[in-house]
């Protein structure tokens, strides 16, 4: 087997993990199951690994040493091209099913859907029966699999129980407990965990060199970036492509402080701007990112209050954390942090969307703790 650097080039940031070693062994022995479940936290790199698996299956020149994809042939580049990292995969034999995917009914519009319904699975059942067009196998990725409705899951189970030849399914889930036990039992599970900081940093340097992305040169900014990632390479990929996540987080903290000091009317006006028109998946995702930032900020305040300042996330904001934490009662801070996390969880499960997302945000904002008068 090749060294870990070569494995990392082929299989990505999780190559040295238990999941990565298991995956390499599957390809080396040519015993890849027809259904894989890749589980792990949001942003840990599940989609990246799924695409690497698809590359390995469709690759024109697979690595003879570690059975990985070459990453440079036509098939590999159509699934991931470092020169165009934001381009969606374009391969006739790879289907990515997600919330908002096409379905079997021409008059259905799923663009704002937060679930994967049975009509989408009906279309996938048909796609699975088709002979691969360009490659020898067909790969169907379902992301996130926990978005399957009950009816869709039941229908999909039948396909898993009798998978068509030369068709492989890869299910991705950050909440695998929401998948039925029967579906999970039909899949081989690979669990991805957050990476240690040193491994994450090594991967980040390699990925930046591959994509031509410029990383922060300031050591403090770089350290804060790695802390914000919490060991999640997928989070870094998504956020660095979109801009400067450290500056964005600073702006989100500014908003959190401003809204905490705002009047009731000002809070509701801000909620209208953020969630009043959150009727599509992208708007809901943006709201979730804001709540993630708020959760991190209020957690830092709580850590400061409980003499755990060494564990705060936003080290560059230490002075603001110290000053702000002194304005709130510790119990109130803890209670509000729980409220943020409950609101975030509701939206994550798709229970609240559209006007209901606005209502959830209203309730949250109206329960921000009252600060003490500063001396």
Model-derived features: where do they sit?
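Charged, glycine-rich active-site and insertion segments that engage polyanionic ligands
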Residues: 1-56, 60, 64, 78, ...
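Clamp-loader machinery-focused feature within the broader ASCE/P-loop NTPase space
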Residues: 1-151, 325
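Short, structurally constrained coil/turn elements
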Residues: 88-90, 163, 183
């Amino acid at each position: 087997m090749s060294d870990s650097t070569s494995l990392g080039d082929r299989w990505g940031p999780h190559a040295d993990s238990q999941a990565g070693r298991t995956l390499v062994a599957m390809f080396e022995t040519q015993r890849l199951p027809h259904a894989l479940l890749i589980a792990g936290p949001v942003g840990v790199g599940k989609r990246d690994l799924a695409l690497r698996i698809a590359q390995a299956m469709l690759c024109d020149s697979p690595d003879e040493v570690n059975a990985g994809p070459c990453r440079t042939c036509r098939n590999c580049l159509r699934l991931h091209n470092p020169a165009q990292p934001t381009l969606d995969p374009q391969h006739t034999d790879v289907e990515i099913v997600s919330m908002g995917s096409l379905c079997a009914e021409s008059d259905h519009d799923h663009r704002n859907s937060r679930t994967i319904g049975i009509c989408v699975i009906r279309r996938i059942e048909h796609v699975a029966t088709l002979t691969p067009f360009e490659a020898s196998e067909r790969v169907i990725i379902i992301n996130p699999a926990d978005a399957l409705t009950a009816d869709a899951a039941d229908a999909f189970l039948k396909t898993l129980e009798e998978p068509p030849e030369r068709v492989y399914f890869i299910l991705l889930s950050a909440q695998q407990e929401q998948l039925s036990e029967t579906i999970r039992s039909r899949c081989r599970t690979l669990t991805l965990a957050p990476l240690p900081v040193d491994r994450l940093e090594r991967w980040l340097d390699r990925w930046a060199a591959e994509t031509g992305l410029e990383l922060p040169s300031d050591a403090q900014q770089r350290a804060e970036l790695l802390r914000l990632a919490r060991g999640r390479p997928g989070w870094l990929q998504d956020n660095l492509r979109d801009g400067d996540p450290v500056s964005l987080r600073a702006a989100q903290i500014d908003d959190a402080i401003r809204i905490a000091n705002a009047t009731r009317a000002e809070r509701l006006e801000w909620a209208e701007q953020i969630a009043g028109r959150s009727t599509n998946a992208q708007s809901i995702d943006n709201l979730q990112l804001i709540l993630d930032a708020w959760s991190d900020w209020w957690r830092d305040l709580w850590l400061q209050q409980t003499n755990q300042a060494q564990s705060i996330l936003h080290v560059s904001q230490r002075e603001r954390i110290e000053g702000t934490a002194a304005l709130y009662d510790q119990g109130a801070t803890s209670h509000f942090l729980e409220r943020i996390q409950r609101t975030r969880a509701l939206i994550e499960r798709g229970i609240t969307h559209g006007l209901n997302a606005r209502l959830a945000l209203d309730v949250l904002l109206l329960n921000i703790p009252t600060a003490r008068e500063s001396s």
